[in-house]
Amino acid sequence: MDNKIKTIFLCIVFLVIGIGAGYGFEYEFSYQQTKHLIKNIVPVRENNFNYHYIYPLLRYDFGNAKYFLEDKNLEEKINAYIQQQYQAQNAESISVYFSNLSAGTWSGVNADTSYIPGSIMKVLIMMAYYRESQLDSSIMAKNLVYTDQVNQAVSKIPYVNPVNLTVGQSYSTKYLLEDMIENSDDAADTLLLLNVNQSILDDVFGDLKVTVPGTTSNYTISPKDYTSFLRILYNATYITEVDSEEALSILSKSTYHDGIYAGVPSGVEVAQKYGESLDVDPQTKEVTATYLHNCGIVYAKAYPYTLCIMTKAKGLTDHKQQAAIIKDISAMVYKYVNSGSGK
């Protein structure tokens, strides 16, 4: 009997030791894993060496920790819709990136796929001028003349938007920025580009870790990368708080009311930019693909969020089907957000 008791006692002791050791190992593994994740959360700072005492912060890169913030439920809904559109041959490629600006949760479907951006890059030109205004406050009032030479250059741009400028007339930089963003006026864009401080514009691209378009052919960007510009404006971490507020106010006055804007209820503010572009065969001059993108911040009642949708269709299209796809995804995301999900 005594031997049996001893045996039972020893078994219990070894069991307790085993459980303790297992718990200790699990704790140590969990601790090391958590430590690794935390170490991978790193600040992304301005690529600016003009300062001696400061190193301005733009945002944080969450590394592998970001996967704990991934909203897979929304992702699955978006992906199911995209697959339906592929089956119906309504688009060749669709990419979406969503980010909750309050809680940091995100969803992405083909979010790292890159596209020819078109006019959505006008936002960076605006940021460059606001950046320059911090050095020279008179820049916004400076008048620029819309010449016939500029008008000739504008007429050669594919998908050129209605030009609101008159040859021979002068316009303030501030007016041109508003026209470029609100109406996506390519004339205003061209005139601003010809007069921008190129060094500051290059710095903007460098600071935001984006390749300068002129340094590469077939320039492309992904929805995920583009969203970082919107987040930086929202957080006011690159240009001043006053300028960031003003820039987003201009974006909220966009006259483009298809896409994301059409997918949310009337009265919901959307600070957004859209862009169109084409792929053209260099030999035959035939249009092989049409691009339509729409990216912005939706100020939903539940919480503000970024949504960037990029689309590519085969051949030359009128954008209607692509705009409908963007609208549908926007409506889906808005409904999901305001149902209390994704917090």
Question: What are the language-model segments listed below?
Answer:
Residues 127-135, 182, 228-235, 331-335:
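Short glycine/serine- and small hydrophobic-enriched flexible loop segments
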Residues 259-289:
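Active-site Gly/Thr loop motif
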Residues 58-74, 146-253:
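Active-site-adjacent helix/loop patches that line small-molecule binding or acyl-intermediate pockets
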Residues 104, 116-149, 180, 307:
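Active-site SXXK
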Residues 99-101, 180-184, 195, 216, ...:
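Active-site-proximal beta-strand/loop segments in catalytic clefts of secreted hydrolases
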Residues 83-90, 135-137:
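Signal peptide-proximal N-terminal region
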Residues 90-114:
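Short, conserved catalytic-motif segment at the N-terminal edge
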Residues 2-82, 88, 106, 234-255, ...:
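Structured C-terminal helix/loop/strand segments within mature extracytoplasmic catalytic/sensor domains
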